[in-house]
Structure formats: C-alpha cells, structure tokens
Curated annotation (Swiss-Prot):
Active-site residue numbers: Y80
Effect of a null allele: Abolished the production of AF-toxin I, but not AF-toxin II. Impairs the pathogenicity to strawberry.
Name under which the protein is recorded: Aldo-keto reductase AFTS1
Gene from which this protein is expressed: AFTS1
Family of the protein in this entry: Belongs to the aldo/keto reductase family.
Length: 366
C-alpha cells in the first residue's frame, strides 16, 4: 500500500478551502454547520412586493456569487415576496448546478402567503393581516401554527423550493391560539418524515420559547436548535432574557436586522439612495438621538481602523452569536461581510460602542 500520496491534502481540497471565505459554525448544540454570514432572503424575490427587493435575474446571480465564496446558508420565509424568494432559491440551485446537499436552506412558516388565485398582484401582502385572514375562507388553516396549517405551509414551501427537505424550518412567530403541544408534535412529525432536518424559531418572548421547548422535552419530541432574534448594536433588548436562555440551553442564536437596514453601514450624516434606506426600517426607532450617537461611534471606530462601518457592527455581533442574517444586495456587500471575520474589537472599543445604549421598547415579537 502506497501511503506516500496521502501525506499531503488533495489540491482540489486546498483550492476549495481557499474559495470558502466564510466561517463555519455549529448551530447551537446540534451537529448542523452553517456559514457566517447567512444570506438573508428578504431581498430575494420580486420588486413589486417591495421596491428594495432584487428581481429574479439579479437574485440568481447574487446567490451564485454567495455560494462561490462559501456563503452556503440561505435564510428565507414563505411570505417573502409571497413565495417568490423560495422559488428563486430553488431555481438558483438548478440553474447553477449547485448540489442540494451543499446548501443549508432555512425557511419559515406562520405568516399567510397571498393566494395568487384570488389576488394576482404579488405586491399585495396578506401576511400582516392575521385577524382578517382568519375570517377568510381562502386563508383559514393556511397560516399560524396549527397542525393543519404547518403541514399545508411546509408542503407549499417544499414545492416552491423544489426540494425534498428543508434543512431548518423556523416558526416565524409564536401562535398563542394553538396549544404548544399541537405545534411541537406537528413539527416533530415533519422531522420524523424527513421533510425537515432541524427546527428553529424566530422573535418571541423568552417565556413563549421556553413553553414550546418544554412541551417538546417532556414528550421526547424534537426541540428547537436555533433562535433568530432582532439583534444589533441599535437593538439589544434580547439580551435581557432570550439570549441568556439560549446560551444556557444550547440554542444557537442568529440575528436579523443585523445592520439595522443599513443604518449601521453608513455615517449618520450620509444620505442613502437605496429604496430601503430612503423608506425607512421595518420597525420604528423610538430613540433616534441614542441611535445616531451609536452610529456615530461605529463610524468613528471604523475610521480609526480604516475599515467599513459594517465590519465594526458585524465584528461586535460575531463575538456574541452563531451568525448574522444579512440582506446582501450586491457582490460588494458579500465581500465586505466576509472580511468582517478578520476584525476583532478590543474591550475598550466594545465598551465605547455599547455605553450609549439604553433600554427601549420591545419590537419584532408580533
């Protein structure tokens, strides 16, 4: 047996490592490895849904660029562009011949997806009107976290993604109308059916998340391995309880709103031309004076280091979570986010960035 040829790694493996610019981390106590950063799919879809969304051609090219650089974890939701985000991710895999097993797809269920059979305008979002949807013959059992609605939503997502399984199925929010046991048993059954590999959750109160985890644990069902929180230098309320709970119980934390819709990526006095920046963030800033001061400090730190502001904000996050979900809208933004892995803030810099923050109203749980 000739062992000499095995003394050095294959050239193909070395080249693959060089091309893989992302950092890879385990998602909580699970065995699943995800990339840091995670590509956010809210930007992927149809501009009719929102004017800052990339169209199909732009999205497919962006997904290819992300994959080639090692960003192999893509986060989306059934409601994003009313399902178009999921469709485009599935199409990108086919168009670029990307093996399904080489990409981690995270999607979400709970919100209503507008039915094209009764509303052909893809720009209309039913997701934000749950009370009205619950009174509609066309939407009952098509949103929320009942067994019936979860199964319906997952089957629809699988078809749009053109895949046999979802790597991480996340519940988009807590559903107080459904018994925790019903929700968790339905999710567990999907894992047993191999339609879902892992379970995750997104923004809710810590006690709600604990109730769901307890329901799964006491019945020996599949538990959540991740929590996707609203979290950034401008919004740190999840540090009160949720992040502590996740760290104590081995749940991997990932963040949405990581750069606060780009506010943490540009100086406070710089006007933005991007539609999302012009039209404002999803949630209201209840303390703009505080936010402007934090943004000023991020800018000052970035200038002193000679790096983009986004890398300062992401370096702060990367030390505290598994990975940030980022709406990467261009190849330049992908490269910028990937280079944040080389930035390590000092204790003094962290204190400087954090000290202007004061507690604020909870946002993003509904």
């Amino acid at each position: 047996m000739n062992y000499e040829k095995w003394r050095h790694p294959p050239v193909s493996l070395v080249e693959s490592v060089k091309a893989s610019r992302a950092v890879y981390k385990r998602l909580g106590n699970s065995g699943l490895v995800v990339s840091n950063p995670i590509l956010g799919g809210m930007h992927i879809g149809n501009p009719k849904w929102n004017d800052w969304v990339l169209d199909e051609k732009e999205s497919i090219a962006l997904l290819k660029a992300a994959y080639e650089r090692g960003v192999n974890t893509w986060d989306t939701a059934n409601m994003y562009s009313n399902g178009e985000s999921e469709k485009i991710m599935g199409k990108a895999l086919r168009v670029h011949n990307i093996p399904r097993s080489k990409v981690v797809i995270m999607t979400k269920c709970c919100r209503a997806v507008t039915d094209p059979n009764i509303e052909p305008d893809i720009g209309i979002s039913t997701a934000f009107y749950p009370e009205l949807s619950g009174q509609s013959k066309d939407y009952v059992n098509h949103f929320g976290l009942s067994r019936a609605s979860i199964f319906q939503q997952v089957e629809a997502s699988l078809q749009r993604l053109n895949t046999d399984y979802i790597d991480v199925l996340q519940i988009h929010r807590f559903d107080p109308e459904v018994p925790p046991e019903e929700t968790m048993k339905a999710l567990h059954d999907l894992v047993q059916m191999n339609k879902v590999r892992y379970l995750g959750a997104s923004s809710m109160w810590a006690h709600e998340f604990a109730i769901l985890q307890h329901a799964a644990e006491k019945n020996n069902w599949t538990k959540f391995v991740s929590m996707q929180n609203h979290y950034s230098l401008l919004y740190r309320e999840e540090e009160r309880e949720m992040i502590k709970y996740c760290n104590l119980t081995g749940v991997g934390v990932i963040s949405w709103g990581s750069l606060a819709s780009g506010r943490l990526a540009r100086p406070p006095d710089q006007r933005t031309v991007s539609p999302r920046g012009v039209n404002g963030t999803i949630y209201k800033d209840y303390n703009p004076t505080q936010s402007e001061e934090i943004i000023r400090r991020v800018h000052q730190t970035a200038v002193s280091r000679g790096i983009p502001m986004s890398q300062v904000a992401l370096a702060w996050l990367n030390k505290r979570i598994v990975a940030p979900v980022i709406g990467l809208s261009s190849v330049e933004r992908i490269d910028e986010a990937l280079d944040a892995k080389a930035v390590e803030l000092s204790h003094e810099e962290e204190r400087y960035l954090e000290s202007a923050y004061r507690a604020q109203s909870i946002q993003g749980h509904a």
